Amino acid sequence: MSDHLVSDQAPSSPPPDVSLLLRAHADLTGESANLAVLTQGRAEYVAQVPGRHTMRTFTEVGNRVALHCTGVGKALLAAVPPAQASRLIGTAPLAAQTAGTITDPALVQAEIALTRARGYALDEGEMEIGVRCVAVGLPGTAPMAVSVSGPAARMTDDLITAAVSALSAAAAELRQQLA
């Protein structure tokens, strides 16, 4: 395994056939599906397939976002070794994107521990008001995360449960592609 696969300098190009995987998840949930990598201490979106609804979430490929307040960011933090996650989170208060953003580094650390334990991350309107995101990280590879996001009214707990199962399968398939 090359050194760049365990650093926070992941390549900015998606693995082959990732669009097919993302399309399957967008079709399953009706919501936008994303792939993000850890790049220079931020989550960088490298692929997205939009959901089928007129009102949907959209992120531009190449956009970099904070780790502490996004589903993909939390999944990325949970996918790297704990010491690296701690270094990325730091000790200073973190920037709030919404009133729901967790800004206390100790609480972010607790959220990452929960993410590791349950196997998925949630963004409950922490980056954008009214948007929920569920994401699964790919530990043991270049730090990557797959996610589904959409308006909170449609991203019900039942949809999130179904998405977690599907995203976990996608993460396993991506790990195989990268092996």
PLM features: what roles do these ranges have?
Residues D104-A166, A170:
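Extended hydrophobic
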Residues Y45-Q48, T57-T59, S147:
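Beta-strand scaffold of nucleotide-dependent catalytic cores
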Residues A36, E44, V134-V136:
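Conserved hydrophobic/aromatic positions in well-ordered beta-strands
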